Amino acid sequence: MKKFVQDLTVTSVEMLSPKHVLLKLMADKPLPEITPGQFVEVQVDHSPSTYLRRPISINFVDDQKNELWLLIAMVGNGTRQLGKLKPGSQLNCLYPLGNGFTLPADSNEKMLLVGGGVGIAPLLHLGYVVKKRGGTPTFLLGARTREDLLELDQFNQLGRVFITTEDASLGEKGFVTNHSVLQKEKFSRIATCGPKPMMMSVARYAKANDITCEVSLENKMACGLGACLCCVEKTNEGNRCVCTDGPVLNINQLLWQI
């Protein structure tokens, strides 16, 4: 898939929580085809501490507005700078990078989208595309507390939403794999993104129940093009660069001890 380096215009900066910001970026021409699960690498600036581009999952794509959304956790100097951008600013982006989630071949296929923390980001776009193709996605979203649950209104517009929080402030108490919906219903496909322990738990559930499952890995990366090899993941097919062979991989490819 062809990649582009473009200056995109910031049209909106919305603080979703003290730690999370939603940037909406507009291109001056039609966006390329973007598969749910792909990501961008953004250039913060050219100072030594933030010289390397930051990989950010694509949260949503609005083709009518030539706009893409980036949901960002402000955890370091680079991402905190992104949170300080103003509408009208320019952000240099390399995109679309990596692969994406496999879409259901049948609109009747029962698909579960499991996200934890800011790992929910690519699932909004995925759920939108699944619904657009005639499907009805089910979301299972987890967080430590209700304040960490993001974009719930948007998810509720796309399908059913089930929630867990560790402190029981919203939804069922506990982790996503403890939610009662997993005991009550059967799913044929799972897509998940979030903290690695959560994804491993989801993968364990999927394997035990013979469910096709893909995970979106969040390995640290730099170039986004498979050249620097800092994002390598060991698989049963050899070493794979998460930035080019991923970030989405089938759990049967992984060497996780689950």
Where are these regions (language model features)?
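Ferredoxin-reductase
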Residues: 2-87
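FNR/FR-type flavoprotein reductase catalytic core
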Residues: 77-218
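Structural signal for conserved beta-strand scaffold positions within catalytic alpha/beta enzyme cores
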Residues: 12, 60, 163-165, 215, ...
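Short, basic/aromatic-enriched C-terminal tail that caps enzymatic domains
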Residues: 1-4, 239-258
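Local cysteine-cluster metal-coordination motifs and their immediate loop/turn environment
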Residues: 218-247
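Short, Lys/Arg- and Gly-enriched loop/turn segments at beta-strand edges
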Residues: 48-56, 98-105, 243
